[in-house]
Design a protein with these regions (language model features):
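Metal-dependent polysaccharide deacetylase catalytic core of the NodB/CE4 family, i.e.
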Residues: 73, 79-93, 101-108, 253-346, ...
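Catalytic grooves of carbohydrate-active enzymes
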Residues: 211-240, 321-332, 336-343, 349, ...
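A glycine-rich, often tryptophan-bearing local segment used as a flexible ligand/cofactor-contacting loop or short
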Residues: 56-127
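A glycine-centered loop/beta-turn motif at secondary-structure junctions
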Residues: 15-18, 42-43, 75-76, 118, ...
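C-terminal domain-boundary segment and adjacent tail
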Residues: 25-27, 205, 209-211, 216-220, ...
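Active-site beta->alpha N-cap acidic-glycine motif
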Residues: 191-281, 328
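Helical hinge/lid and interdomain linker segments adjacent to catalytic or ligand-binding clefts
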Residues: 7-87
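Alpha-helical scaffold elements lining the catalytic groove of polysaccharide deacetylases
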Residues: 236, 293-322, 365-402
Length: 581
């Protein structure tokens, strides 16, 4: 329910739309009319402010019929703080049954918030997570204190609750004491979403939608991978010893992808190659640029970018042929730098996706990135080619947990120097990741990408799936045949060469800003869908003259001197003077 011009209800509608939930916005008067007239066809999930909800309860309680209709027609309600603090206080006391219940202003010295698992399955991966909110979270928020046992605190600070599960006349009411609802259209200047800045405006409503609507978009599984940037495949690289690291992976249940610089394709150690080849469930490699020179994929020159991409993939193919180590066709940008042109070019290669920390291009006038963009499984703003986002461990377990709540894969990035304490910080972090609610599936980076999608059941035996990378693993885990309707965002259908499911070519259709195709899978059957794009032709031009080759070689060798010797023995000197990448 909404008042005319309510900005928060508009934000609620956007969040519901993001999860694919249909919305019927009504004024309080319209809802009360339909409610009294018994014109509500199915049980509703109600979203409104405390001001409106308080007035609704006053209307309901005017007759026994009103209470009966409430019980018969409402599934549950999500209530957030309105502008009338007195109405919020009265509502809190009514729902808790505690006439002495108090609402205190949150202050900027607020302690850690704890997300409870008191309502089984409600908070998903976030259950049990503790996080420290930023100052932005405490404005327009209150702490609810009540001595009754009616309330279940879902998000709390000490004994006070900021989000609670209550009841009214036998119907579950989720009660948030903040006035803010996350705005999915808000631009993110950094391109990175930090849940610590939006705990109260985001976690309650996302948790409720996932709990209340069985038909919402969701990820079929939570996948994870640790990515280590840059190492040459030799016995040791900086603080990283591949044999010892394998033992850690086995003991602590995780997998590692090496973002491998194609320039190093002839330099892998036979012993380490054998280690990777014999342990594909633990070790994998992806494509980390081409030469790893400064901003090599930040150019706007499409021919140069195409040449770089093709050279990188050719080198990776040579490395695979030479060593037998398969590589994931996923690009990890050196220094995180990319341009819009680079994304357009990479889409028309054999790469299936990109993985990056940054989501804003280095173009003079970059595209704006919104909250909705970074909440998605992958950022799809650049030529409909995905950027799967990754994070450093120091961004907090809470950010990885919230990503997983949204359905995003957990891609963790480190450099070898993060292992400088004998991997203690890393292992502590991985162990905490593995204790999150919901099983993490540690996979190669390519598997993480190809298994990342969101889906929902349209009808019995019919699944709608949205794919992001140009390769998707589709599975039917049920004992019955299942029909899959698959869609992918695409604004340039003329770029598509063909679509295959295994060896079978599929027909597809273009509709607005997406392509759609369908397939049938027998019980317990799986297949891999691949979208192939027309390649870009080269004009034969190359920037790789002798001077460039020498400078690139010096850059790579100096980087290894830094990582293998200087950082280990002269870390303070390196941090001040040695900036080769």
């Amino acid at each position: 329910m909404t008042n005319d011009g309510s900005s928060e209800q508009s934000k609620v509608a956007k969040v519901l739309g993001f999860f694919g939930v249909p919305v019927l916005a009504q004024s309080a008067a319209q809802f009360r009319h339909n409610f009294v007239a018994d014109e509500i066809s199915s049980k509703v999930r109600l979203f409104c402010s405390s001001d409106i909800f308080w007035r609704l309860l006053e209307d309901i309680e005017r007759s026994p019929v009103g209470i009966q209709q409430w019980q018969e027609q409402v599934h549950s309600a999500f209530i957030y703080a309105g502008s009338d603090v007195d109405a919020l206080r009265k509502l809190a006391r009514k729902l808790t049954g505690d006439k002495e219940a108090t609402l205190n202003d949150m202050n900027r010295s607020a302690r850690d918030m704890l997300v409870s698992d008191g309502v089984v399955g409600f908070c998903g991966v976030m259950a049990g997570v503790s996080l420290t909110p930023s100052d932005a979270n405490v404005d327009h928020s209150f702490l609810l204190y009540s001595s009754t046992r009616v309330a279940t605190n879902i998000i709390s600070i000490g004994q006070g609750a900021v989000f609670s599960k209550l009841e009214y006349q036998g119907i579950t009411v989720f009660f948030s004491t903040t006035k803010e609802i996350i705005d999915l259209d808000a631009k993110i200047s950094t391109g990175v979403f930090d849940v610590r800045d939006h705990v109260l405006s985001a976690v309650p409503i996302v948790s409720y939608i996932r709990w209340a609507f069985t038909e919402h978009w969701h990820a079929p599984e939570i996948n994870a991978s640790l990515v280590v940037d840059d190492p040459v495949l030799k016995q040791s690289y900086g603080f990283l010893n591949f044999q010892e690291f394998l033992s850690l992976m086995r003991r602590h249940r995780f997998s590692t992808n090496v973002a491998f610089i194609p320039w190093n394709w002839r330099r892998s150690s036979p012993a380490v190659v054998r280690l990777f080849r014999e342990n594909p469930e633990a070790y994998s490699i992806s494509v980390h640029g081409c030469d790893h020179t400064s901003a090599e994929f930040g150019s706007s020159d499409r021919q140069l970018l195409c040449w770089k991409a093709k050279q990188a993939l050719a080198r990776m193919d040579l490395h695979e042929s030479r060593t037998g180590v398969h590589h994931d066709r996923v690009m990890v940008f050196p220094q995180g730098v990319f341009s819009e042109a680079a994304m357009s070019v990479l889409k028309q290669t054999d790469l299936i996706a990109t993985v990056n920390n940054d989501t804003i291009s280095v173009d003079l006038h970059p595209l704006a990135i919104t909250t909705s963009d970074v909440w998605d499984i992958a950022v799809m703003r650049y030529s409909d080619f995905p950027i799967f986002t990754r994070r450093y461990p120091w961004e907090g377990i809470e950010n990885f947990a919230f990503d997983a709540l949204l359905g995003k894969p957990a891609i963790i990035v480190i450099h070898h120097d993060f292992c400088g304490d004998g991997c203690l910080k890393l292992i502590d972090f991985v162990d905490r990741m593995n204790t999150l609610r919901g099983r993490l599936n540690w996979r190669s980076l390519g598997e993480v990408v190809s298994r990342s999608c969101r889906q929902r059941e349209l009808l019995a035996g019919v699944m709608e799936v949205e794919m992001y990378g140009t390769e998707l693993r589709v599975q039917n885990p049920s004992g019955q045949p299942k029909h899959f309707v698959i869609r992918k965002r695409e604004h340039d259908p003329s770029a598509i060469k063909c679509i295959h499911a295994g060896s079978r070519q599929l027909s597809w259709k273009f509709s607005g800003s997406q392509i759609d195709f369908e397939l049938e899978l027998k019980s317990y059957e799986s297949t891999t869908v691949r979208i192939k794009f027309h390649e870009i032709g080269l004009d034969g031009r190359s920037e790789e003259n002798l001077s460039y080759k020498i400078r690139t070689m010096m850059r790579r060798y100096l980087s290894e001197v830094r990582d293998n010797y200087c950082i280990r023995h002269m870390p303070s000197f390196v941090s001040r003077h040695f900036k080769v990448n």
